[in-house]
């Protein structure tokens, strides 16, 4: 069976690199897509979510923030602000970030950066959800 190579990159460098991917599932702004070897070349915007990576012998989840994916016949390149493998997520830290974001959203006196707080809450909830998928 032909496989994909997959690379997830953030501004801090490569976070994940694998050569034997059978299927990758991603959340794009147009909905969830699955990518296998031979997929039509595509570029898509990604939402905060996860990448599920299936390979012979198992699967892995990576929490990702907004970004882009470039699909080629045999290669998948994911470029995001942040990416974190499920088994490396510090759930306590994610819970703390969630509490801070909720506190900021509930503070009626300070409604500046409401969108930033909403995105922070969405990222924290995503990290908690992905950590529980492993």
UniProtKB/Swiss-Prot annotation:
Lipid bilayer topology: Peripheral membrane protein
Function per UniProt: Produces ATP from ADP in the presence of a proton gradient across the membrane.
Record keywords, A-Z: ATP synthesis, Cell membrane, CF(1), Hydrogen ion transport, Ion transport, Membrane, Transport
Database matches in NCBIfam families: ATP_synt_epsi, PRK00571.1-3
Localisation per UniProt entry: Cell membrane
CDD domains: F1-ATPase_delta
Disulfide bond sites: none
GO cellular component: plasma membrane; proton-transporting ATP synthase complex
GO MF annotation terms: ATP binding; proton-transporting ATP synthase activity, rotational mechanism
HAMAP family, per database record: ATP_synth_epsil_bac (MF_00530)
Family: Belongs to the ATPase epsilon chain family.
Protein name: ATP synthase epsilon chain
Lineage start: Bacteria, Bacillati, Bacillota, Bacilli, Bacillales
Assembly and binders: F-type ATPases have 2 components, CF(1) - the catalytic core - and CF(0) - the membrane proton channel. CF(1) has five subunits: alpha(3), beta(3), gamma(1), delta(1), epsilon(1). CF(0) has three main subunits: a, b and c.
């Amino acid at each position: 069976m032909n496989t994909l190579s997959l690379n997830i990159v953030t501004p801090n460098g490569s976070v994940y690199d694998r050569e034997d991917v059978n299927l990758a599932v991603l959340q794009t702004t147009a909905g969830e897509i699955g990518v296998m070897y031979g997929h039509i070349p595509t570029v898509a915007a990604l939402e905060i979510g996860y990448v599920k990576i299936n390979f012979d012998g198992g699967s892995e989840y990576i929490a990702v923030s907004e970004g882009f994916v470039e699909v080629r016949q045999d290669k998948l390149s994911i470029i995001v602000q942040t990416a974190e493998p499920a088994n490396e997520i510090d759930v306590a830290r994610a819970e703390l970030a969630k509490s801070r974001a909720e506190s900021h959203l509930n503070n009626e006196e300070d409604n500046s950066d409401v969108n930033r707080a909403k995105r922070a809450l969405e990222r924290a909830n995503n990290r908690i959800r992905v950590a529980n998928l492993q």
